[in-house]
């Protein structure tokens, strides 16, 4: 059986200035800074908040770069390989798409994007009062980020500590809801002689809650509720 592959982008996009004062795109990943050229920026942007198959990357890249007039010096495949080597694009593989998704996400560290419901409500209310947005549309905006029970559990844990998907699976498997300090993390996740940060992904793959957590993480990511990081 031919292996399945899935890809996504990791890190947080920001901007900096070079020695000439020119603004440049940059990815923050694992506390390190990575400058991007235009082709790398286009490719990273195609995959950010998406989980895609290899054959889908070309179409996404062509759609984003169409009309830019930019002619890169390398092929798209060469750029993909370079970004994978730099760690800015990650891939997962497996016999099934579920296996590939687990391989992709299990080692990813989850960083929730700060959501401010009160600020969102006040902004939408202001637009309604100014007749910029209809009430029916406002209701849809405010409903957009409603989360399932599994998604809420993932976000609650991720807000307390920097955890990988596999570590969140272990927490939910052990019914852990509070992680006030590093000692509680070690006690909840690495409280036996067998579990390490290197093998936890393999150990929790068959846990009863794994599928639900994996789907929750993937859905939250594709709804732009979180980003992935590496340590």
How should these model regions be labeled?
Residues 7-49:
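N-terminal ordered "arm"
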Residues 34-231:
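Long, charge-rich, low-complexity alpha-helical segments
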Residues 2-6:
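A structured, charge-rich N-terminal accessory region that forms the first stable segment of a protein
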């Amino acid at each position: 059986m031919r292996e399945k592959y899935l890809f996504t982008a990791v890190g947080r996009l920001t901007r900096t200035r070079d020695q000439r004062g020119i603004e440049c795109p940059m990815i923050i990943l694992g506390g390190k800074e990575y400058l991007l050229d235009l082709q790398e920026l286009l490719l990273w942007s195609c995959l950010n908040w998406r989980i895609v198959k290899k054959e889908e990357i070309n179409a996404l890249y062509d759609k984003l770069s169409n009309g830019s007039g930019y002619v890169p010096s390398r092929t798209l495949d060469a750029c993909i390989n370079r970004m994978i080597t730099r760690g800015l694009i990650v891939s997962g593989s497996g016999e099934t798409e579920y296996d590939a998704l687990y391989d992709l996400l299990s080692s990813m560290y989850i960083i929730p994007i700060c959501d401010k419901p009160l600020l969102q409500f006040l902004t939408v209310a202001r637009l309604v009062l100014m007749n910029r947005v209809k009430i029916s549309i406002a209701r849809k905006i405010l409903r957009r980020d409603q989360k399932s029970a599994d998604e809420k559990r993932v976000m609650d844990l991720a807000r307390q500590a920097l955890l990988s998907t596999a570590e969140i699976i272990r927490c939910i498997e052990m019914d852990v809801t509070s992680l006030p300090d590093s000692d509680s993390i070690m006690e909840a996740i690495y409280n036996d002689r067998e579990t390490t940060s290197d093998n936890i992904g393999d150990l929790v793959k068959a846990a009863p809650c794994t599928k639900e957590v994996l789907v929750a993480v993937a859905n939250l990511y594709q709804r732009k509720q979180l980003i992935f990081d590496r340590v």
